[in-house]
């Protein structure tokens, strides 16, 4: 199969298939929470930009479905006043200094930023996995696919040992804080997380296309 087209598969089925692809594509996988201890890259497979692009498109499709579902179920739509304020969330964003924009584009800097940003999103995806009340297949697919995308992009970073992982203590503290909020606020946070991840991936998609 040369495409990540999912028209014939459910989100869960695709996620399981993605795990099989990951198992064959990465014979010696490195856990996301561990830094690379060996700087050599000759034995790591190179992944074409097309695969990363298709995977990003797939994730964006799942996010779109989740946002639509929340809009219909909770009236948490894109133009809702609550979703215009990011409250106390410190969600990853893309800026000019990250080297991902066409002006001032820097492939290595951009790859590092996308990879680290997606790692930072993991704690928020855990939150979605715990509290999203819609189609759980979509939340699972987004989380698994995002981890797969991180692995794909790490193959292209020249110095993967410099890809820092978020502090687990900080992440745990943030997750505990989010969990103490009422359901209305949780729903607002979830739509903010989805919107921010979507924006981040849209910038990432444009950057991957010119790499």
From Swiss-Prot:
InterPro entries noted in UniProt: 4_helix_cytokine-like_core (IPR009079), IL-6-like (IPR003574), IL-6/GCSF/MGF (IPR030474), IL6/GCSF/MGF_CS (IPR030473)
GO CC annotation terms, alphabetical: extracellular space; interleukin-6 receptor complex
Record's keyword annotation contains Nucleotidyltransferase: no
Gene3D superfamilies hit by this protein: 1.20.1250.10
A single MF term (Gene Ontology): interleukin-6 receptor binding
SUPFAM superfamilies: 4-helical cytokines
Leader sequence residues: 1-29
GO biological process, one term: vascular endothelial growth factor production
Subcellular location: Secreted
Disulfide bonds: 71-77, 100-110
Record-annotated membrane-spanning stretches: none
Residues that bear Phosphoserine: 80
Record-linked Pfam families: IL6
Keywords assigned: Acute phase, Cytokine, Disulfide bond, Growth factor, Phosphoprotein, Secreted, Signal
Protein family: Belongs to the IL-6 superfamily.
General function of this protein: Cytokine with a wide variety of biological functions in immunity, tissue regeneration, and metabolism. Binds to IL6R, then the complex associates to the signaling subunit IL6ST/gp130 to trigger the intracellular IL6-signaling pathway. The interaction with the membrane-bound IL6R and IL6ST stimulates 'classic signaling', whereas the binding of IL6 and soluble IL6R to IL6ST stimulates 'trans-signaling'. Alternatively, 'cluster signaling' occurs when membrane-bound IL6:IL6R complexes on transmitter cells activate IL6ST receptors on neighboring receiver cells.
Oligomer and partners: Component of a hexamer of two molecules each of IL6, IL6R and IL6ST; first binds to IL6R to associate with the signaling subunit IL6ST. Interacts with IL6R (via the N-terminal ectodomain); this interaction may be affected by IL6R-binding with SORL1, hence decreasing IL6 cis signaling. Interacts with SORL1 (via the N-terminal ectodomain); this interaction leads to IL6 internalization and lysosomal degradation. May form a trimeric complex with the soluble SORL1 ectodomain and soluble IL6R receptor; this interaction might stabilize circulating IL6, hence promoting IL6 trans signaling.
Protein name: Interleukin-6
Organism: Camelus bactrianus
